């Protein structure tokens, strides 16, 4: 007996040990905690570090963290204490509704080992909700003939809590006619019913006020009240009855909104108002009323909102049928939602390494990927793979986790960046798939310096620019990446006119945009040479340079300056001499002006603005030569005043004026004597002088009117002949003003003396001068003159058509040419032809301008003449052959000197406006006139 017991005890002990071992092995990979709902954020849940066998400090070192699938994080890890704590306030009713056991599963990832531990946390319910009726008041109509013992169902209260904290009992306020009966069903729900204890008498009491109290079993106890108003009516002793107490229906989750599910039906054997049945949807269980709709008249149940199998797989709908007086009955509808493959797989990058060195080994971990599909069954089976022929592969980890690793060695010289595409497909029909992309950079070293696309750059900026204006932008490229390709720009330090280059321009170190730090002046300097350095941010940094030439463009910001006649300092006006015997075209003087600008801004034209004797003098449009327009008469005043305007061709044009005084006399003593004799004779008889002036004004007006008529007739006649010439095709084309630009950047002369010489023996033939009786104070536009000259030249050509000799260009006057010793340059050592053309280099131009300025100053002082000796270009004697032009600045580029193949001369014939003898035999003698 003892041996048997021992054998039996040993066998039982062995079975017990085996069972305990199995339980320990089963629970070794799962951790479970419990926590109450509505705890504050950071409340303790469990010591996760201890349960994982780790120290708290190892949580951060080994990358221990919580991973979840798209759900809001309810818990977090405390790295200091190694505890699992709440991440926010948890509401069990929102999380699990009325499920008795509320479990939340989370995954703990140990990243260094790529291990995942599953943790289950039970959310315990607390009594934080009171029972609540769907309405605060209920009206029940009962016939007075209703027999005692009749039961009247009452709307139930709803408490979202579970267990003892849920709804436990109902209590009715004390009264003489009604009592409360509570029915319990298998699911544990309690349905209150109002029981009539004694017959009602409407004549005694028509309305009864009752209060129904619903209480839960929590601590403290919560309760809710329903105010019941009983109205006594005539008899209605039959409530509506459903055809079946429970309806079942299945529906696919993707059915459209508005789809009819089924139609419920309830009947009432009463008649009239007592038999009118209406259907009511019980709104207590959460959001059922938002998803389903019950027609109160027909009993048709339809869908109000799209169904989702992943949100809810099953719905229980409670409905009521109520007749007219208020009797009702209950039924329920069970809706099963069927799954369809409407969810594509979800790919979550749990851990990612964005860059790897090119010398990395095979099998290096790049990313940890979680793949999940919310569908069920075959629709939730997922496969994942790498797209394309890339040196990467996926390795299966635990659960639905995969590791992305390198399959071969990487070579940055071939590919510096990989765009890895992952595709996950489920097993549904048709299958759904999802793609995600991972960008992987291969780490490089700084082995490439920045490079510019061009060897050098040229930039242009107009002068008088605002400070801070953007000038130019340079861009360099670096094939490296990250800091090795981050380029900064700088200017190499240098000086310009004694000032540091950084005071003129600056460069944005990030964008390479150059800015002007001051306003540039074309007359001060015309170009800057810069050296831009581009450096990367590698270690060590690499750099390269590029040259930038900055050219300043001229603007018309300088008005013409009058060199001759020079403005006196004592307030007096210089006097020019014109002999009485001067013929038309006699050169009285010449206005010399310069413009500090260049190009078109320095092209000068001359206009006669005002004259004391209109029609007596004319001014060359481009030469500034003041000549007599007609022969001097005895009636002409001894003293003539002229106002000459000099205007450049800039936009807008700038101008300057000078006043000339011309004395009509052969010598200075004569003009002094004549002016002295005129003083006393001007006063004797003012009345006779007034009469003479009136008669003179009338005569001049008549002459002017006749002159205008004759002039119009001549112009019409010439225009008619020019049209005939153009029609026949045998005429010579007019020679317009030149619009070519010279090699030194200055526009070519608009017209030349060679035109006059080649057309006629008379030097003034091609320049018809139209006397103006009245002069405005404004400048005559150049366009009006340019439009009139071709017509006049064409007429002269028509008149000379019969004589072929007149159409040949006269040879240039040799007196206008430079000898080898007189040529501007380094002591006349320059080589060139003997045509006397202007030198083209900038240095010689500046010397000639200074020479003209000095000569004009001497002429204003009376110490020299405009003529000078032969070969002096009409300047002072000290600028003759013995004085070269290499030491003086050149203003020639701003002085307008007409003539393409001739230069200034001292020949009397040319100065007086005489041309070489022509073929008409009317050779005129040159007057030997000199001027002061």
Swiss-Prot record:
Subcellular location: Cell membrane
SUPFAM superfamilies registered for this protein in UniProt: Cadherin-like
Keywords: Calcium, Cell adhesion, Cell membrane, Glycoprotein, Membrane, Repeat, Signal, Transmembrane, Transmembrane helix
Region entry Disordered, spans: 805-841, 902-932
GO cellular component, one term: plasma membrane
Residues exposed to the Cytoplasmic side: 714-932
Glycosylation site positions: 265, 419, 545, 685
Key word Signal present: yes
Protein's GO biological process: cell adhesion; endosome to lysosome transport; homophilic cell adhesion via plasma membrane adhesion molecules; lipid tube assembly involved in organelle fusion; nervous system development
Domain Cadherin, chain residue ranges per copy: 30-133, 134-242, 243-347, 348-452, 453-562, 570-682
Membrane association type: Single-pass type I membrane protein
Record's keyword annotation contains Nucleus: no
Membrane-spanning parts: 693-713
Basic residues composition-biased segments: 922-932
Function, as annotated: Potential calcium-dependent cell-adhesion protein. May be involved in the establishment and maintenance of specific neuronal connections in the brain.
Name by which UniProt lists this protein: Protocadherin gamma-A3
Annotated source species: Homo sapiens
Name of the coding gene: PCDHGA3
